[in-house]
UniProtKB/Swiss-Prot annotation:
It is found in: Cytoplasm. This is Holliday junction branch migration complex subunit RuvA. Homotetramer. Forms an RuvA(8)-RuvB(12)-Holliday junction (HJ) complex. HJ DNA is sandwiched between 2 RuvA tetramers; dsDNA enters through RuvA and exits via RuvB. An RuvB hexamer assembles on each DNA strand where it exits the tetramer. Each RuvB hexamer is contacted by two RuvA subunits (via domain III) on 2 adjacent RuvB subunits; this complex drives branch migration. In the full resolvosome a probable DNA-RuvA(4)-RuvB(12)-RuvC(2) complex forms which resolves the HJ. The gene is ruvA. Has three domains with a flexible linker between the domains II and III and assumes an 'L' shape. Domain III is highly mobile and contacts RuvB. Belongs to the RuvA family.
Length: 204
């Protein structure tokens, strides 16, 4: 089973990307959030992969820029009525920490923003994810009712972490330096500023 691919971005389509690994091209199905964060064609990337078998389609590779996203995808698919397409749709509108926060505050409306996810399915997702692992990230930082100040918007943090991982930096280290940069720069920090500050902290 394929768990990760490191290679060059050969093509990027509307629903998938072609990753060239030592001359072998892998078609990887991705959500729009992931596709928009991929490096330019010809540049190297690391894709975390989940293999899904379908009777009609055979094996399909689903790709994510972080282990956290792949873990959330796998967890979402344990819910009745949530297939790969719906799981990707949810992760397109809610990064794992945002999804965990929505579940914590029982915000089914946030989940229902996903394409193809109606109110009933959104309610089921919120209920069934209560006791399941979704994110390793600091969920409280993105909780609407958190008592601690929000250090950074999750979209900016996610983009910055993904960019650092694309440079070969391990996810835990990338998260640590991005969170540190966010605390210094404030909650309005944008991805480029976070990335620059994080790289400076790493001495690059």
């Amino acid at each position: 089973m394929i768990g990760r691919l490191r290679g060059l971005v050969a093509e990027v389509g509307e629903e998938d990307a072609l990753i060239d690994v030592m001359g072998v091209g892998y078609v990887v199905r991705c959500g729009s959030r992931t596709l928009s964060r991929l490096p330019a064609v010809g540049e190297e990337t690391v894709i975390h992969v989940e293999s899904v078998f379908g009777e009609q389609t055979g094996v399909t590779l689903y790709g994510f820029l972080g282990r956290d996203e792949r873990r959330a995808f796998v967890t979402l698919r344990t819910i009745q009525g949530v297939g790969p397409k719906a799981a990707l749709a949810v992760l397109d509108v809610l990064a794992p920490p945002e999804l965990a926060a929505a579940v914590a505050r029982e915000d089914k409306a946030a989940v229902a923003r996903a394409n193809g996810v109606g109110p009933k399915l959104a309610q089921r997702i919120v209920v069934e994810l209560k006791d399941k692992p979704i994110s390793d990230g600091p969920v409280a930082a993105f909780h609407a009712q958190a008592t601690t100040p929000q250090p950074i918007k999750v979209s900016a943090a996610g983009e910055a972490v993904a960019a650092l991982m694309g440079l070969g930096i391990a996810e835990p280290q990338a998260r640590r330096v991005v969170e540190s940069a966010a605390l210094r720069l404030g909650e309005e920090a944008e991805p480029p500023a976070l990335i620059k500050a994080a790289l400076q902290e790493l001495g690059r």
